[in-house]
Amino acid sequence: MNHSTLEIFIQVAETQSVTQAAKRLGRAQSNITTRIQQLEEELAVELFVRGNKKMVLSPAGVQFLSYARRILSLAEEAKQALHPTTPGGSLRLGAMEATAASRLPPLLTRFQQQCPQVDITLITQPTRQLTEGVLTAALDAALVCLPPGADGQPACPAELAFTPVFYETLMLVRPQTPGPLRFAAFASGCSYRALGERWLAEQQAAVEVHEVNSYHSMLACVASGRYACLLPQSVLSLMTLPENCLSEPLCEATTQLIWRSGLSAPALSEWRKLL
């Protein structure tokens, strides 16, 4: 088992395809297939369930994927630790859609100017999925809105560290004409969605959620006169509010940066300083 074999395994797991993994890595398909077979022989388990032209992870493969990501992350951290004054390598960052749209553009520009040797990648997902990504080492860090725990403090998994970085005013956008409403929101796992559903449940008996993929789609739903949505003021200020809609502050929310406790990669340290 070596570094390149783990990279191959992760790519096949993420794409569920030997063909796509080969394209990403610039390798021959036969080489990808052989390396996966060798890895399975070494581990004495089947990592994939082969069928229907897809390479789907087996239960053992799902478990091993988390370890593979952590091994590569630790190897990268060790490499960077040898050159602590010159951040390099990669930084895999996750963020909520709102944060990526309204907060990150100038910060990413500044970070690349200060750390040109760092290869930074960004993905956008809801808070729950981002938290899982950091826990499994698929991400180095993520900007999320942690839900409150029983004590009112952010409910952060014990394996993670966090710090507050942004404070958002969440705006409720709804039609001017009163009446029963549905709620337009991102997929389950979004903290803002949970807050919006709670508000709507206080207003009416039934709560029906329509899932969308963008804030523009949310506003389009509200403009139809049958939906409400919740979005940060920082995002709403970048958009045009439909004429037949009104907006009002509903609550405050905090955006936190989360990362695995003990992770001390120079690139991550520089990103934390920037925030």
Region annotations inferred by a language model:
Residues L181-Q204:
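Secondary-structure junction motif
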Residues E40-L57:
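A short LG(V/I)-centered, amphipathic sequence patch enriched
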Residues Q125-L181, S234-L241:
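Acidic, Gly/Pro-rich loop/turn segments at junctions of secondary structure
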Residues T177-G179, N244-L275:
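A late-sequence structural motif
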Residues E42-L43, F64-T85:
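Alpha-helical linker/hinge and terminal dimerization helices associated
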